[in-house]
Amino acid sequence: MLVNNGGGLPQGDTDNPELIAQPRGGTPSVIDTQKELEAAARALSAGSSPIALDVERAQGFRYGSDPYLVQIRREDAGTFLIDTHALPDLSVLQPGVEDVWLLHDCLQDLPNLRQVGLRPSALFDTEIAARLIGLERFGLAAVAEQVLGLGLVKDHQASDWSVRPLPKEWLRYAAL
């Protein structure tokens, strides 16, 4: 089934999904200084679209589930990859992320986002939505394929995100 995704996304085909292997606009640099974080806060505050967030951890490599990278995407502001090892307090971003948050499996990421000082005012969980509409597979890649007709490269989700510097291929994955 052909899907017109709009918003600059390629047209998808749920029978033959298009593989998305590179982020639109390239891979952004990692934000690891307070000055860069404040610039991201200004950019996010200037936006008005919903905000997609994700967190990368080092589960299976480190004890606990601390966040090591927070990804934020706002269509009209850009993509931000934030090193929470270098910047453990992201509360300066809160005024710029007061719109609807888009998360997948929010129960995994909300505790980490709270840990770095971010709290949603409203959220939409794509995993819960997938379950509610009766999809049989509800992982992020499966939902993107079934609903948007787009395939996601999910090759580094189980990596040790505590490693520094983060490899370029991991950053590409994180920016998708």
Please state what every model-predicted region is.
Residues 1-6, 10-51, 55:
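N-terminal accessory regions of nucleic-acid-interacting proteins
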Residues 20-30, 71-176:
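Active-site-proximal helix-loop-helix substrate-binding element of RNase H-like nuclease domains
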Residues 26, 34, 38-46, 55-80, ...:
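A cross-family signal for N-terminal binding/gating loops and helix N-caps
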